[in-house]
Amino acid sequence: MISRVLYRPFDESDFEPCTQIVQDAWHKDSGNEVYNFFEAAADFSYCLSVSTFSQVAVVDGRVCGIVLARTGKRNMKTSDHWAQVEHDIIQQMQQIEPELTDRYLTFIKTQVRINNWLIEQCPQTPPDEITLLAVSSSTRGLGVGSVLLDAACSHVTNQGGTSAYLFTDTDCSYKFYEHRGFKRAAARKANLNERFCSLPRESFLYTLDLNA
């Protein structure tokens, strides 16, 4: 049976299914599933707060993928809304699992530092970023991820951009981006302290020439 796939902008009603996709991909280490969901929700809320473009994939009526990108100026009302959502979720995380929340915040702080280091290694880093690409495991192989990524790149081009970048790592399917034409511009291996904070073995910055 051929699946029916619809692509459209993100709606707030998509928040829970998109968070579930993010959780299944990157937030399942804790034995507390409620905490895992909150952690994924905080991560996803942050991505929404820094993004200006969204596209979700709906397969047979079910949200199965999302891409976010950042180009130009953000709508500060929308950005502030999602930043507040992230803040509120982290407060809930601290109430149910304070130690895990502290560990998560340390992870985020360390990841930001590593990302900033990667950017420093690439003085010509483009201003436009693919901030998130996540697809449900149940629909991988249908080409959903490729269509979503192409939509984000087309948006960057339509906004006048000529290249884009993204962060990825060894905990992600980074080879996918290479197959889509992205080039590795910088890499950094995690040290022992960073690995203790659950950082991936190696982090990367990839860029894509949209004129190629």
Placement of each model-derived feature along the sequence:
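Conserved acyl-donor/pantetheine-binding loop and adjacent beta-alpha core of acyl/acetyltransferases
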Residues: 73-128, 192-199
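Conserved beta-strand-loop-alpha-helix junction that forms the acyl-donor binding cleft
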Residues: 131-140, 165-175, 191-194
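Helix-loop element at the rim of GNAT/NAT acetyltransferase active sites that forms part
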Residues: 20-36, 45-46, 71-76
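Conserved GNAT acetyl-CoA-binding A-motif
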Residues: 127-128, 156-169
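Active-site rim helix/loop that mediates acceptor-substrate recognition in acyltransferases
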Residues: 32-60, 64, 68, 89-92, ...
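Conserved acetyl-CoA-binding loop-helix of GNAT-fold acetyltransferases
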Residues: 135, 141-154, 179
